[in-house]
Structures are given as C-alpha cells and as structure tokens.
Amino acid sequence: MQEPSEDQATSDELSFVHDAVLLQEAVAAVLGVKALPKQTDDESQNSLQASGIYVDATFGRGGHSRLLLSQLADDATLIVFDKDPTAISVARELANSDSRVKVVHDSFATLTDSLAAMRITQVDGLMADLGISSPQIDDGSRGFSFMRDGAVDMRMDTSRGQSVAEWLETVDDETLANVLYEFGEERHSRRIARAIKQMDSYDSTLALAEVIKVAHPNWQRGKHPATQSFQAMRIFINNELGDVDNFLEQSIPILKVGGQLAVISFHSLEDRRIKQFLQRHSKGQYPEDENLPMPPKRPRYFSKPKRVGPSKAEISHNPRSRSAWLRMATRTDADYVADIHP
C-alpha cells in the first residue's frame, strides 16, 4: 500500500484546501472517549473540558490541534511539533491567540528532550498524523510533487539538512536503488536508479518524474510511475521511518497511566511499524535476544489497541484520505523498564 498519489486525484483535489484526515476519530482517541460531544446551541455541552497536557506531534495546518483545543479546559496545555517552517508559522499564530499552545520547531523524534526543556516529563495524550500533508504536495516549490514543477528538494524542514537534489549528485547507483526499493517498495529500483544517475542535473521535479516514467517498464493504471520513487526519496531524506520508531518508543515513558496514543499513517511502511510496536508492547511478549538465556518478560505497556479507517463519507469528501489508518492504544500502569528495549 502506498501513500495517496497525485495522479489519483482529480483536478479539484489538486487545488485542494487541506482537510485533516480522521479528524473526529483521532481527537476522540487522544482524549480517550468513543466520540466527541455533538455540537448543539448550548455551547456548555459542546466541549469535554479535558484538563491535562497533550501533544500534537505533527501540527501541519492545525486541523487536529484546533478541534482538540475546543475540547480542552482553560488550564490544559497543548504542545505542537512540526519540522516544516510554514507549519510552524501557522502554529505560532495560533499560539499568539491561545495561551494554552506551546510550539516546538523540530521533529517529534525529539519528544523527550523537547518536553524536558519545558520541565514536562509526562503527558496525558499523544497524537501524530504521519507523512506528507496536502499543502506540501500542492506547493510545487517544495519538491514533493511530480505533477507540478519545482526544485528537487523534498525536505520537511527547508532550514536544515540536505535536499534530494544534493543527495542525488553524490549517491551511487546501488545506494539509490536500495533506497527506492526499501522505502518505496519499487520492484524496478535498479533500472530507475541507473536512469536517474544519467541525468545532467536535478533541478526539476517534472524532469525527474519524466525520466522515471520512461525508465519504468510497467505502468499501473491510475498511478503515476514516479509515485513510489518520489515517496522513497522523501522518506529517506527526512529519516521519516527512523523518526517514527523513535517517537513510538519515547511514547512509553512519556505517557501517563491511562494516557492515550493515537497515530494516523498513510502507507504500509508506517502502518506496519505502528502495528508491530503496539503488538509488541500490548502482549507482554519475551524480547528476542539470543544473548539472554532467560530474557525478562517485556511489560505490557499498552492495552486496547485498535485500528480505524475513514468512513465512506470522508473518502467521498476527501479522496486523499482513502489510504489512511488510525491506530490507538491506552497506556497501562506498567513501569517503564529501559534496559529490555526495543
């Protein structure tokens, strides 16, 4: 399963105003309720007025954060993370108008250290919406799109790190092919890698997409042949899967007893990681370690793991939600034991 691709979108979608995916479901999950209150004329009945400290680890354009804020009490705190400078600008505007909001311009992989800098050791809920956002796709200058021309950048945080174009200038064919295969599940990775490395320059996403298109021997109907390669390069350059792994592991000590974890993913590489993480930490399994003759049993850190997908109505309204999955779980009272992880 891959991320929703641009070629699967209609022309209306490509001029899309971002809608947060699984909005009601994710916010209800992070608050530990089955559903949010129905909105009525009686405003006092429209909010849960939940107290505590919550984290939106991927602010984006703030859809999930704004709904979550509407359900929080005046003494609650919402800490929002994002790598993207544009997203951070939006987050700071929100923080200026709502004192409950604290902004961190960094990856959610820095969760523990960033919270420690605020003298926060534990929180009541963690929420993340993984992958690329629609505004990032729709902005050709960011380099994520193979339907709009722009620089071959693909960095989530344009203020730091190496762009895809810079990486392509120096990477060898074999390493590139391995990246396309591992992070894009591209079966024709070697053929595509050779074609990419024969390019004179890497200054146009449309030119890069065309080279991949020509090199790709099998076109899948309804899917641009560059979809998986673009996904792979973006995931690699941003260390997305490594950040997800770090975030998930940090969620164990960071969540209070009864705290909620809610994570939305859009492709199988991410969803598989979340699924395996929750399975591993909700069953009290023995860790696989051949060096330990009688390894200690891993504590059961999470209970009630569930998976929820978008409704037919949401998919109809927002086709880009079709591949989304929300996984959620509740932190148990098991003490965190660091020396038997992962």
UniProtKB/Swiss-Prot annotation:
Keyword Transcription: no
Signal sequence interval, chain numbering: none
Amino acid composition bias (Basic residues), ranges on this chain: 297-309
Single biological process term from Gene Ontology: rRNA base methylation
Keyword vocabulary terms for this entry: Cytoplasm, Methyltransferase, rRNA processing, S-adenosyl-L-methionine, Transferase
Keyword rRNA processing found: yes
Binding residues for S-adenosyl-L-methionine: 62-64, 82, 108, 129, 136
EC code: 2.1.1.199
Region (Disordered): 280-319
Compartments, as annotated in UniProt: Cytoplasm
Pfam families per the UniProt record, alphabetical: Methyltransf_5
Entry GO terms, CC: cytoplasm
Gene3D superfamilies: Putative methyltransferase TM0872, insert domain (1.10.150.170), Vaccinia Virus protein VP39 (3.40.50.150)
One term of GO molecular function: rRNA (cytosine-N4-)-methyltransferase activity
Top-level taxon in the UniProt lineage: Bacteria
Stored InterPro entries: RsmH, SAM-dep_MeTrfase_MraW_recog, SAM-dependent_MTases_sf
Catalytic activity: cytidine(1402) in 16S rRNA + S-adenosyl-L-methionine = N(4)-methylcytidine(1402) in 16S rRNA + S-adenosyl-L-homocysteine + H(+)
Similarity comment: family membership: Belongs to the methyltransferase superfamily. RsmH family.
Protein task: Specifically methylates the N4 position of cytidine in position 1402 (C1402) of 16S rRNA.
Name of the protein in question: Ribosomal RNA small subunit methyltransferase H
Gene responsible for this protein: rsmH
